[in-house]
Amino acid sequence: VYETIQDAVNATNPGGLVLVDKGIYYEEVVVRTPSITIRGIDRNNVIIDGEFEKANGIIVAGVDGVVVENITARNALLNGFYFATVEGYRASYVTAYNNGDYGIYGFDSVDGVIDHSYASGSPDAGFYIGQCYPCDTVINNVISENNGLGYSGTNSGGDLYIVSSIFRNNMGGIAPNTLDSELLPPERESFIIGNHIENNNNIKAPAWPNQYITLGNGIIIAGGNNNIIKNNVINDHNVFGVVVTAAFDDNYWPAHGNLIQDNLILNSKKADMALSGISNLGNCFKGNTFQTSFPPGIQTSGECGDNIFSRGSDLSGLWSSIARIVYVNQGSFEVGDWRTMPVPPLQQNMPSANSFFMNIFPAVNVFDKYKIDYTNIKLPETAEKYLN
């Protein structure tokens, strides 16, 4: 028995288990041993609290194969759970709330699984996967609310799946994007399938300036290429349900080859679907159920081909984004304080988590081993009422 999680982690050999009893642990856990599993016996009552002083709840940097399960991290200055420069990682049944940057954060890391998890109160994003190609990562069955963004993915993609999840009441919803500030641009080949993306208009959410720019949009593909947005329910956004737009940083990044297919998009105040920017080539909208588009006639009646060029793009959305950036840079926006966001409701525990004899599987080839049928993704139950 150890007094701190850190002491137990330091004493554990590769392949071992750290089973954490109920309690509030005022520490930052730094993992330096590969292939260990850190598991709480009660997701809602095993809490790592950063006291608004420590950088992260749990940080796994340069150490492969680590698994974190059934734990809550709150009140860190930066991130709840942070995986950086690793090959093989998994976070299951974890809760991250009221952390100063991201909730669950994977950066420069591949072969990952994040599932059955929850994030709120993050001024950047509840969930983030950045700077990886191919990422070989899946985010499945998560809830992200009251964040700057529900999901952000800068310069990531390649077998990157975001499925069967709920993104609601954030400032902006899901934002695959390209920036010059990270390696491996552009963002590409992300699969956003079977999610419920709802009411991301939350002006009271915490947010940085870049997140404020996304306010009122469900899915924003900003300078991304060859993404597939399919079979989602996207409703009640004050600007766009889905918008495909160029991104501008040090360089100008057009959006190419994105497929927006078979989504149900409802009650968007400006337009359900939009295409904006210059030289956006080969973007395809087909089979979607919607009412309005910007510009009109954005959806083709048949199969999309190479003849779908920038003729359908509208520059007014781009100018609107530029105007909002100017507004933000003048400091003319108010957001919520991540330190005082609401405490989330109790979340589902991992089955049999309090058993020391539960199987231990280090995060090795976790993406390939993850048993999910990507051709038959189920929507969250919250979306069902919109399908009838």
Describe the residue ranges of each PLM region.
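Right-handed parallel beta-helix/beta-solenoid
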Residues: V1-D7, A11
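Right-handed parallel beta-helix/beta-spiral solenoid domain characteristic of secreted/periplasmic
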Residues: V1-E3, L17, K22, S35-L77
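Solvent-exposed coil/turn segments that connect beta secondary-structure elements
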Residues: G23, P34, I41-R43, E53, ...
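Short glycine/acidic-rich loop motifs that flank beta-strands on beta-rich extracellular proteins
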Residues: Y25-V31, D49-N56, L77-F83, G100-F107, ...
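Right-handed parallel beta-helix
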Residues: R39-N45, D64-N75, E87-Y102, V110-A125, ...
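Extracellular beta-rich repeat passengers
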Residues: E53, Y93, G194, A207-T214, ...
